[in-house]
Structures are given as structure tokens and as C-alpha cells.
Design a protein with these regions (language model features):
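Residue-level preference for short coil/turn positions at secondary-structure junctions
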Residues: 12, 76, 109-111
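Single, functionally critical "micro-switch" positions that shape active/binding sites
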Residues: 34, 98-99, 120
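Short Fe-S-cluster ligation motifs
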Residues: 111-119, 145-149
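Secondary-structure boundary/linker elements at domain or insertion junctions
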Residues: 1-74, 124-149
Length: 149
């Protein structure tokens, strides 16, 4: 009764590397995070930091930059990067579009990404596949720049 029992590895106290909260490690779970939300938030912040510095490991053609749309919109002050429109139109929420400034879908560097309103997007050269034979087409189908079709 008064004897100290050794702490099992599964009952080890750990500190969450995201929020700093102390927690008991559960068997089969990571001992770095107290909950799934902390793990996702931490990994999201790490990946966004790679986008900010332009790390090549995150700049792949098959990498999806859309989870960072909210972060990019916050950096822009919550308005369209071109016209400055707020995300509201006639009392309804306006969904902004994540745009690659140079039109290259594989270039996911932070300085090439911006959030724009649908009106500004429709005025760009890349709207609705107008750049159909741009770099994405040649990347996917392996065509030479001189060939079309």
C-alpha cells in the first residue's frame, strides 16, 4: 500500500511540444502531443514555415498549397490582393481563390501565392484554363515547347 510502484512506460508524463501542456502518454500514441489538434496545428505551422522560407522540399508539383489559404489571406489583411475587396458581397460570404501569380502550378513558393476575389480572378490570363498549353500541360504530357496537340 505504501510501496512505490514503478511508473509504466505507458503512464509516463510527457509535455506537449505545441501547447506545453503536461499529459499522460497513451499506449500506441505519440509522446510529443497531448491531442490530435495540437499535432495538426504543429505540423501545419512547420509546413507553412517551409513555404515562407521557400524550402525546395515543400515546393513540389504534387504538393497542395490550399491548407495555407487561410494563413495567406490573414497576411493580406483579409482582403483581395489585387482590388482590396473584403470577403463579403451583398451580405454573403465571398470565397477567395488561391492564385499562382506566375501561372505555374508547380511554383508553390510563398511569394508566388496570393488570395484574390472571383472578379479579379476572371480578369487574369490564367482564368478557366486560358493557359491550357502553359507549363502545366507540358509538364503532364511531356510535350516539347514547339509542339502543340
Amino acid at each position: 500500500m505504501g510501496i512505490d510502484t514503478p511508473i509504466r512506460k505507458s503512464e509516463k508524463l510527457c509535455i506537449c511540444i505545441h501547447c506545453g501542456k503536461e499529459f499522460k502518454r497513451k499506449p500506441g500514441y505519440s509522446n510529443k502531443f497531448c491531442c490530435v489538434e495540437c499535432e495538426h496545428s504543429y505540423k501545419h505551422a512547420q509546413k507553412y514555415a517551409l513555404i515562407i522560407i521557400g524550402d525546395a522540399s515543400i515546393m513540389r508539383a504534387n504538393y497542395n498549397p490550399y491548407p495555407f489559404k487561410k494563413d495567406i489571406l490573414e497576411e493580406q489583411g483579409g482582403v483581395c490582393a489585387i482590388c482590396g475587396m473584403k470577403p463579403e458581397w451583398n451580405g454573403k460570404e465571398l470565397i477567395f481563390i488561391l492564385d499562382h501569380i506566375d501561372g505555374h502550378a508547380a511554383n508553390n513558393k510563398r511569394d508566388n501565392l496570393r488570395c484574390i476575389c472571383p472578379n479579379c480572378d476572371s480578369q487574369l490570363d490564367t482564368y478557366k484554363s486560358k493557359n491550357k498549353f502553359g507549363d502545366r500541360y507540358y509538364y503532364r504530357y511531356g510535350k516539347d515547347r514547339g509542339q502543340v496537340g
